[in-house]
């Protein structure tokens, strides 16, 4: 006897892309005007933090990314949480024993802003192996909000993706794949402190350029594509080329090398071994091993 399951995954209602908004130059200019407000000023490892080092931030970032993947969060939750983390660390000296607590609170805040069903404090405590209590997260949530002046609607690189892709006019059968690859680049950039002080528009533009060239999604040469992308966001061509070739693609090669040497470490599961939210309509970004250089 054969069994046939016709039950589909329940999807949350979503509005489709609005061509008028995507094509309105005022939307893009508004984001470009606001983005500098949310970029850390200078390296906080040199002038603010005494105990925390860059490799500690990277370890925390990988853990936060794994939690987001396990919970099938929206693609922009993780980079937004890293933006909160960098902005807090750029102005408040923090002990290394408090770093995971800070990262957990940043995940909580980002999910509240960008998720339909945000992560719960209890679930986040499970992911820390009960290393922190719910009351600590609640206290630090208020603390982080105060230090960020309650300004949580930060402009991040993800906000530019749809606007830039709309202006590229790529073949319709390649747009989704290019976007997915670009999202992977953005997640990778968020784990690397090198990109913390880059304008989000430059990171988004460089990520799309790397994705388009890697997939061969258009007939333009590398120089022509770079000039077109630079014109869309008003970025200098040389700066964009350096960001794409010397930083983003180099970071990807390093990540691929690390992935080949070490197996991914599992994160603690929610009760029952799976997300209590059930299947989600959002998917995690394409794995770095699926990227074509």
From Swiss-Prot:
User: What is the superkingdom listed in this entry's lineage?
Assistant: Eukaryota
Q: Which residues carry this modification: Phosphoserine?
A: 265, 280
> What does the UniProt keyword field contain?
Cell cycle, Cell division, Cyclin, Cytoplasm, Nucleus, Phosphoprotein, Transcription, Transcription regulation, Ubl conjugation
Specify where it is mainly localized: nucleus
Low complexity: compositionally biased ranges: 271-286
Sorted alphabetically, which SUPFAM superfamilies does this protein's record hold?
Cyclin-like
Residues with Phosphothreonine modification: 284
What biological process terms from GO does the record include?
Answer: cell division; G1/S transition of mitotic cell cycle; hyaluronan biosynthetic process; negative regulation of transcription by RNA polymerase II; positive regulation of cell population proliferation; positive regulation of G1/S transition of mitotic cell cycle; regulation of cell cycle; regulation of cell population proliferation
Cyclin N-terminal domain location: 27-152
| Gene Ontology, cellular component aspect | cyclin D3-CDK4 complex; cyclin D3-CDK6 complex; cyclin-dependent protein kinase holoenzyme complex; cytoplasm; microtubule organizing center; nucleus
Can you say where in the cell this protein is located? Nucleus; Cytoplasm
Stretches the record annotates as Disordered: 257-293
UniProt-listed Gene3D superfamilies? Cyclin-like
Q: Name one GO molecular function term.
A: cyclin-dependent protein serine/threonine kinase regulator activity
Processing and modification events after translation: Phosphorylation at Thr-284 by MAP kinases is required for ubiquitination and degradation by the DCX(AMBRA1) complex.
Q: Could you tell me which Pfam families the record lists for this protein?
A: Cyclin_C, Cyclin_N
InterPro entries per the UniProt record, alphabetical: Cyclin, Cyclin-like_dom, Cyclin-like_sf, Cyclin_C-dom, Cyclin_N, Cyclins_cyclin-box
Q: Which PANTHER family match?
A: CYCLINS (PTHR10177)
Q: Which family does it belong to?
A: Belongs to the cyclin family. Cyclin D subfamily.
**Free-text function comment from the UniProt entry:** Regulatory component of the cyclin D3-CDK4 (DC) complex that phosphorylates and inhibits members of the retinoblastoma (RB) protein family including RB1 and regulates the cell-cycle during G(1)/S transition. Phosphorylation of RB1 allows dissociation of the transcription factor E2F from the RB/E2F complex and the subsequent transcription of E2F target genes which are responsible for the progression through the G(1) phase. Hypophosphorylates RB1 in early G(1) phase. Cyclin D-CDK4 complexes are major integrators of various mitogenenic and antimitogenic signals.
Assembly and interaction partners: Interacts with the CDK4 and CDK6 protein kinases to form a serine/threonine kinase holoenzyme complex. The cyclin subunit imparts substrate specificity to the complex. Interacts with ATF5. Interacts with EIF3K. Component of the ternary complex cyclin D/CDK4/CDKN1B required for nuclear translocation and modulation of CDK4-mediated kinase activity. Can form similar complexes with either CDKN1A or CDKN2A.
Protein name per UniProt: G1/S-specific cyclin-D3
Q: Gene name?
A: Ccnd3
């Amino acid at each position: 006897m054969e069994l046939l399951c016709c039950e589909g995954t329940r999807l949350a209602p979503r509005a489709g892309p609005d061509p008028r908004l995507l094509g309105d130059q005022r939307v893009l200019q508004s984001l470009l005007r606001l983005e500098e407000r949310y970029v850390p000023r200078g390296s906080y490892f040199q002038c603010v933090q005494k105990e925390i080092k860059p490799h500690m931030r990277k370890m925390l970032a990988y853990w936060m990314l794994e939690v987001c993947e396990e919970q099938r969060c929206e693609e922009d939750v993780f980079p937004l949480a890293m933006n909160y983390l960098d902005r807090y660390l750029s102005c408040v000296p923090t002990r290394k024993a408090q770093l995971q607590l800070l990262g957990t609170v940043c995940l909580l805040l980002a999910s509240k802003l960008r998720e339909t069903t945000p992560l719960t404090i209890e679930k986040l405590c499970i992911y820390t192996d009960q290393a922190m209590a719910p009351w600590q997260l609640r206290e630090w949530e208020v603390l982080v909000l105060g230090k960020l002046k309650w300004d949580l609607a930060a402009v991040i690189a993800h906000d530019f993706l749809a606007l830039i892709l709309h202006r590229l006019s790529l073949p319709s059968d390649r747009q989704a794949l290019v976007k997915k690859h670009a999202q992977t680049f953005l997640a990778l950039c968020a784990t690397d402190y090198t990109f913390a002080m880059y304008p989000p528009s430059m990171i988004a533009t460089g990520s799309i350029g790397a994705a388009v060239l890697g997939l061969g999604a258009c007939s333009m040469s590398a120089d022509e594509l770079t000039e077109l992308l630079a014109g869309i966001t008003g970025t200098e061509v040389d700066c964009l080329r350096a960001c794409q070739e010397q930083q983003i693609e180099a970071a990807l090669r390093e990540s691929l090398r690390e992935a080949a040497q070490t197996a991914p470490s599992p994160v603690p599961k929610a009760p029952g071994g799976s997300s209590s939210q059930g299947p989600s309509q959002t998917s995690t970004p394409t794995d770095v091993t699926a990227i074509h250089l």
